[in-house]
Amino acid sequence: MSLYINIKDTIYANLAKAALEAQKAGELSFESLPNYVLEEPREKQHGDWATNLAMVLTKQARKAPRDIATILIKHLDTEGTFITASEIAGPGFINFRLDPNWLTGVIPEVLNLEADYGKVNLGQGKKVQVEFVSANPTGLLHMGNARGAALGDSLAALLAMAGYEVSREFYINDAGNQIYNFALSLEARYLQLMGQDVPFPEGGYHGEDLIDTVKGLIEKVGNKYLNVDQDLRREFLVRYALEEKLTSIRETLTDMGVHYDCWFSEQSLHDSGFVKDTMEKLEQQGYIYEKEGAQWLKSTLFGDEKDEVVVRGNGTPTYFAADIAYHRNKFERGFDRVINIWGADHHGHVARMKGAMSALGYDPENLQIILMQLVRLIQNGEVVRMSKRSGQYITLRELMDEVGKDAARFFFIMRDPDSTVEFDLDLAKAESSDNPVYYVQYAHARLCSILRQAAEQGYNTAGIPQEGELKRLQSNEERELLKKIAELPNEIEVAARLTEPHRLARYVLDLAGLFHSFYNSQRVLVDEEGLREARLGLVRSTKQVLANVLGILGVTAPERM
């Protein structure tokens, strides 16, 4: 357990013990301790920690909050802790002040744990699956896919850091109507490029990339599929194009630093009979009925506005039917928790999917769906809607070519998924402190530069400073930097519990800012050995923490810039 979390847990435990002692002494009356908050005050003059326990006990204890706070402080045992003072503030908050020397333990902790610093055991080894991107394999990755990639991969890394066993998954939509339309589109382009005057199907895929795919195919097979059975031709065209598109998707995501443990085929659910079996199970449970020749799921039971068709009149399952089967399959694979990242336009699908899982006997609370809002690209102060290269939507590949992988990932992960991302292309390329990813990476490069200079001057850059040396770190800039470093394990735990990796982007920006303030006010390589050793330990710890958090976010930590 980290030093920071240990201190926090100690205060929690001592508060609970004080309340029980007061109850035993007849000074406080309550049935059970209510949920209360222990957090760092926004104003530094209010101490290191503050709790609202006295205020939330008022209703049960039938006393004024400040009177309850006085009683709690009276029974608070702080011996053997870092607590040096307990004070009542405002309407009844209790503020705690800690011995400043508690921070001396932070640097040895970081330097001993290295890449493991920040790890917590919130998940206790539970199996979590994160499914994200899952783009249609009929085209190229767009901005919505890009945001989902950054969010999903960072969330998976965060959960792994928090003690979960995590599996990343991409669901391949290689079945259903969209693949049929894809086949018709490919066939039309093939025949057109072979000189035949055929119409393009209504609702077909018009992308230039599809034409490029067919041109590449013709270079390999020529007119071999011109005068063959239509079904054979379509089957070949789809198989060829899907393989090419999926290869492109894999390569683009790999270049973004995103890797998957499983690529799961929708078609495999149909081929194995699992979709049919799932619909039969729902029918046996009384959740499916027939109307107008089709089979309908009673999704209104789950809060939907209307029931949904799951099997069409011609006997073919809908995409929703396959999706229900897919989610059943996830739970059958033994995942304790399943997380999906979807575009906000799928919000109407959430209640019915959770309801379907409930109907199949699974706890819907174990299915979490995170909805993402749109991405707007901005250049020269204006919204960019089309690619200059293709005249169509801008692809993830084009974005990375323009601003690089690191800027793409950081800009997408900075915002809460529920907020629209305004991606400023000019800012993402700027080499200035206004560019958040540059600001953070520059901090890491500057830390590396200090350590190189120290090594060149023959100073020790490998050992762990002694406690007496670390007590020399007394400036405000040093203390604030140490406190921020100490917070990382707690920040990991909170971000993982809330499934909010964007909190870590905020954390690393704050850490970089505190380091830059320290750098501008304190010289590291001073003549006094004890102070120099302590500051070098602080530099190494800051560098390690920056690298750890950037690693979760999938952003490189450069040694030189």
Swiss-Prot record:
An example Gene Ontology CC term for this record: cytoplasm
Compartment list: Cytoplasm
One Pfam entry name: Arg_tRNA_synt_N
UniProt-listed InterPro entries: aa-tRNA-synth_I_CS, Arg-tRNA-ligase, Arg-tRNA-synth_N, Arg-tRNA-synth_N_sf, ArgRS_core, DALR_anticod-bd, Rossmann-like_a/b/a_fold, tRNAsynth_Ia_anticodon-bd
PROSITE patterns, per database record: AA_TRNA_LIGASE_I
Catalysed reactions, semicolon-separated: tRNA(Arg) + L-arginine + ATP = L-arginyl-tRNA(Arg) + AMP + diphosphate
Entry protein name: Arginine--tRNA ligase
Organism of origin: Desulfitobacterium hafniense (strain Y51)
Gene (name only): argS
